[in-house]
């Protein structure tokens, strides 16, 4: 008779968000990455106003090639696996592009 023991490890996700800076000029390119660690590999999703914007396994990125004032706001990164769920937030601030021709 053969006895076997298996140990299954599970670790709830932990999130790390890379965003420098948090303020951007309208029209610039922006990329914000949310990375999560955990066992098993977590699913990562970005949300704004409860609408999913991006998803991936272990990482998900918010990418704006031409950020607009309407992109301004609070975004939520959520990571989950069988061991748990966690979330973190980032505030995206978009400033108007200064145009010298508008100055009188």
Regions found by a protein language model. Name each.
Residues 1-104:
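Immunoglobulin-superfamily
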